[in-house]
């Protein structure tokens, strides 16, 4: 596996490899912030399976962190990440520093930032964007830069960050980016907990409790799938189905609900009801919940999850 730290190295590699194969080969790309786990591995394995070359980037992107968020404490596990990537037969790791990606610097205060940035208006302000107002501006900007550097045929993203995928799909479509996006299913443990780099902050007991996030979403999905033809469930009925599962953990202060959403898959517009008809468009039930660690009550971890129907 080749490890590159500059744009010039990636461009030179890409030009040389494709020239030798007369541009008949494909490049798959998996952008990450490191601290890789089995969820990332599933994306990478899919790329290796489907493409001639696979490029993975590891870059902890400052522009998607707010001044109140602790960029310095984001987990960085590069030596372990490299071992995993080598075992997965990745061709190139691109691991730039912040100066490479943001030549004018990247202060966390948006008012002090200079240079070009990408905003996807209308989608970025919803759900995650309410809690993290400039998060998707940072994501869209860094992904645009990475797409321009790698020039991959296809890029792989996990369903767990579904709003990110929807925002980036809009960006790719409307900025005419020549990279296809592919969303891969959420990787879960045996009891349904979505794998996340944040899980490592929780003790085993709190991780076990967190498995109820998926139980709540799954209960809502089952209620929808049981609808008879022409049947209808209101928004409140669906969301109540979710929160009833979580109620004991809210009462015990293990969970603090940020949001539960019932939305159109493409627009993320909130739905008033769901009807079992052929005209019903795909929907996404998503959530964000703050989980307080039982061993270290000062540790609060925000977990997200979703189900697409």
UniProtKB/Swiss-Prot annotation:
GO terms for cellular component: cytoplasm; nucleus. Its EC number is 6.3.2.1. Pathway: Cofactor biosynthesis; (R)-pantothenate biosynthesis; (R)-pantothenate from (R)-pantoate and beta-alanine: step 1/1. It holds the Pfam family Pantoate_ligase. It is found in: Cytoplasm; Nucleus. Signal peptide: none annotated. CDD domains: PanC (cd00560). Keywords: ATP-binding, Cytoplasm, Ligase, Nucleotide-binding, Nucleus, Pantothenate biosynthesis. It catalyses: (R)-pantoate + beta-alanine + ATP = (R)-pantothenate + AMP + diphosphate + H(+). Belongs to the pantothenate synthetase family. NCBIfam families: panC (TIGR00018). Required for pantothenic acid biosynthesis. This is Pantoate--beta-alanine ligase. It comes from Saccharomyces cerevisiae (strain ATCC 204508 / S288c) (Baker's yeast). The lineage of its organism: Eukaryota, Fungi, Dikarya, Ascomycota, Saccharomycotina. The gene is PAN6.
């Amino acid at each position: 596996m080749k490890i590159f730290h500059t744009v010039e190295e990636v461009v030179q590699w890409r030009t040389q490899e494709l020239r030798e194969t007369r541009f008949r080969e494909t490049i798959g790309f998996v952008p990450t912030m490191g601290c890789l786990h089995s969820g990332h591995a599933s994306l990478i394995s899919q790329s290796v399976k489907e493409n001639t070359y696979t490029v993975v980037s590891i870059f902890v992107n400052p522009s998607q962190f707010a001044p109140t968020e602790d960029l310095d404490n984001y987990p960085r596990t590069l030596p372990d990440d490299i071992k995993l990537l080598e075992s997965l037969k990745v061709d190139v790791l691109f691991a730039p520093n912040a100066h490479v990606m943001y030549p004018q610097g990247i202060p966390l205060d948006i008012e002090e930032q200079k240079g070009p940035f990408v905003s996807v208006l209308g989608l970025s302000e919803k759900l995650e964007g309410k809690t993290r107002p400039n998060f998707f501006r940072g994501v869209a900007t860094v992904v645009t830069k990475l797409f321009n550097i790698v020039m991959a045929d296809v890029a792989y993203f996990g369903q767990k960050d579904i709003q990110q995928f929807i925002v980036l799909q809009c960006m790719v479509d409307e900025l005419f980016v020549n990279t296809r996006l592919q969303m891969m299913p959420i990787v879960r443990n045996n009891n349904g907990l979505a794998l996340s780099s944040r899980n490592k902050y929780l003790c085993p007991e709190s991780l076990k409790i967190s498995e109820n996030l998926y139980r709540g979403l799954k209960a809502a999905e089952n209620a929808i799938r049981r609808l008879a033809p022409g049947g209808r469930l209101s928004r409140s009925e669906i969301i109540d189905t979710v929160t009833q599962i979580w109620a004991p953990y809210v009462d015990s202060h293990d969970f603090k609900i940020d949001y539960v959403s019932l939305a159109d898959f493409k627009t993320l517009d909130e739905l008033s009801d769901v009807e079992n008809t052929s005209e019903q468009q795909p929907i996404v039930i998503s959530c964000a919940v703050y989980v307080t660690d039982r061993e270290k009550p000062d540790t609060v971890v925000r977990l997200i999850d979703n189900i697409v129907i």
